[in-house]
Regions:
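Intrinsically disordered, low-complexity terminal tails/loops enriched in metal-binding residues
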Residues: 22-180
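Intrinsically disordered, low-complexity segments enriched in Ser/Pro/Gly/Ala and basic residues
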Residues: 3, 19-23
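Positively charged n-region of N-terminal signal peptides that target proteins for export
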Residues: 1-7
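Bacterial N-terminal signal peptides
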Residues: 9-20
Length: 180
């Protein structure tokens, strides 16, 4: 009897460890997916900031690929339902970004992708680093940044123009303010 209890205990322990390892591996894969998406986004942002349309087109292809492959995993049902619609919007906006024929169209689509990505990041905790949502009142456009300091990708002649918006969901953005 003691041997069979030990065997049952050992079997349960092994099963628990296997499930834990699979869960950890799944979390690592999900985090890697989120990292690829956000890194692709940041490459496009850099190209837009540098007014590098040709280089941006190459990075946009990678961003659109990451957006299309992005899966919503490990969420509560209500978050899943809400983010499914946001994810579909982001896919459509990424396709528009990919088909942009000039820098102005690229910037417009990039702002739309930003708003969807921020909503997803906020819910899924996509990065351990501080990420800030920022806003350009002149262009009425958003972007994400690792820095609190404003480096506006939309206004080449006014790089410091903008405002910091932090921790707000889509639709809760403050009223635009004029730059000084």
């Amino acid at each position: 009897m003691k041997n069979s209890l030990k065997e049952i205990y050992a079997t349960c322990l092994i099963a628990f460890m296997m499930i834990s390892c699979q869960s950890s591996h799944g979390q690592d894969a999900a985090q890697a997916q989120r990292d690829r998406l956000f890194n692709a986004y940041m490459e496009v942002k850099k190209d837009i900031t540098d007014e590098n349309f040709a280089g941006g087109k190459g990075h946009v292809v990678q961003l659109e690929k990451e957006v299309q492959n992005f899966r919503l995993k490990g969420l509560q049902l209500d978050d899943m339902m809400r983010l499914k619609k946001v994810s579909q919007t982001m896919k459509s906006d990424a396709a528009s970004l990919k088909s942009a024929e000039d820098m102005k169209a690229m910037k417009t689509s990039f702002s739309a992708v930003t708003q969807s990505l921020f909503t997803i990041m906020e819910t899924m905790k996509c990065t351990d680093e501080a990420v800030y949502l920022q806003y350009c009142p002149m262009e009425k456009a958003y972007w994400l940044s690792y820095d609190k300091e404003i480096e506006n990708p939309y206004a080449a002649s006014m790089r410091n123009c903008g405002q910091l918006v932090k921790g707000m969901a889509t639709g809760d953005y403050p009223e635009p303010v004029a730059c000084h």
